[in-house]
């Protein structure tokens, strides 16, 4: 067999990962219910481990098909790009719901909140302290990931590795600052609708930063092991798009919730 096929598409081989991933998601869901109602975390941890293992194995297969088997033709890459764009659009609407909840409560505070915003008794964080530093850190990481992209397209391998490493470190630094800010916050998620919307919106953004940092760490490892070329590096492009999306969401969070909302 020559491996010839009369079309440019990649027809994937039968894979166990969709079935395993669905089972893992079900296990995690049941585990969350067990944690909420019975304070038992064993099933939830099992579900998390199964999901992480499935993600690693599945993406390992995708990397092998793209890098070592050459299955990702220009047509396949076009589909992947459109899929990533649609995924980011879905994430935009995900965060739109949190902003809607925040403005629904803040633009017309109810009597229960003291007809004021922030609610009576809630002392918001200083927008010009740690949040401003976090803004500078995340915007700087956006610059360094763009630097890495240009270095990669120009074939400057060492420069791409260095700038990617700086981006990852800035992402981890942001996460550390966010965790410290949560620890020092004078209110909790249970303190009125302000605490709920604040921690849910910024918490999910923090989760996206962790996911994006992990994505970029994988890209850094792949760059070290010569997986990318100047013309074939969609994995990194997707990570860069995702990271810029995280940057933009943070700017809206900072302006709306930290600055205007306080």
From Swiss-Prot:
The keyword Chloroplast does not apply. It is found in: Mitochondrion inner membrane. Belongs to the cytochrome c oxidase subunit 3 family. Keywords: Membrane, Mitochondrion, Mitochondrion inner membrane, Translocase, Transmembrane, Transmembrane helix. Changing residue 160 to V: In strain: Bf-H07. This is Cytochrome c oxidase subunit 3. Component of the cytochrome c oxidase, the last enzyme in the mitochondrial electron transport chain which drives oxidative phosphorylation. The respiratory chain contains 3 multisubunit complexes succinate dehydrogenase (complex II, CII), ubiquinol-cytochrome c oxidoreductase (cytochrome b-c1 complex, complex III, CIII) and cytochrome c oxidase (complex IV, CIV), that cooperate to transfer electrons derived from NADH and succinate to molecular oxygen, creating an electrochemical gradient over the inner membrane that drives transmembrane transport and the ATP synthase. GO terms for molecular function: cytochrome-c oxidase activity. GO terms for biological process: mitochondrial electron transport, cytochrome c to oxygen. It catalyses: 4 Fe(II)-[cytochrome c] + O2 + 8 H(+)(in) = 4 Fe(III)-[cytochrome c] + 2 H2O + 4 H(+)(out). It comes from Branchiostoma floridae. The chain crosses the membrane at residues 11-31, 32-52, 83-103, 125-147, 160-180, 198-218, 240-260. Its main location: mitochondrion.
């Amino acid at each position: 067999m020559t491996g010839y096929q009369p079309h440019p598409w990649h027809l994937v081989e039968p894979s166990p990962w969709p079935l395993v991933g669905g089972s893992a998601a079900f296990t995690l869901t049941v585990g969350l219910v067990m944690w909420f109602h019975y304070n038992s975390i064993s099933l939830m941890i099992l579900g998390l481990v199964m999901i992480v293992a499935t993600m690693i194995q599945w993406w390992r297969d995708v990397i092998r098909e793209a890098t070592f088997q050459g299955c990702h033709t220009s047509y396949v890459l076009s589909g992947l790009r459109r899929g990533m764009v649609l995924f980011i659009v879905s994430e935009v609407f995900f965060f739109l719901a949190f902003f809607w909840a925040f403005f629904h409560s803040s633009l017309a505070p109810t009597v229960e909140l003291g007809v004021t915003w922030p609610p009576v008794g809630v002392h918001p964080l200083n927008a010009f302290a740690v949040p401003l530093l976090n803004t500078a850190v995340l915007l700087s990481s956006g610059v360094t990931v763009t630097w890495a992209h240009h270095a990669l397209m120009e074939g400057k391998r060492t420069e791409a590795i260095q700038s990617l490493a700086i981006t990852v470190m800035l992402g981890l630094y942001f996460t550390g600052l966010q965790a410290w800010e949560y620890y020092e916050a004078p209110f909790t998620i249970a303190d009125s609708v302000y605490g709920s919307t604040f921690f849910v919106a910024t918490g999910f953004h923090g989760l996206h930063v962790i996911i994006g940092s992990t994505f970029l760490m994988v890209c850094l490892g792949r760059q070290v092991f010569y997986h990318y070329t100047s013309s074939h590096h969609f994995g990194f492009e997707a990570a860069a798009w995702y990271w810029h999306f995280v940057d933009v969401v943070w700017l809206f969070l900072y302006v709306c919730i930290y600055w205007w909302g306080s």
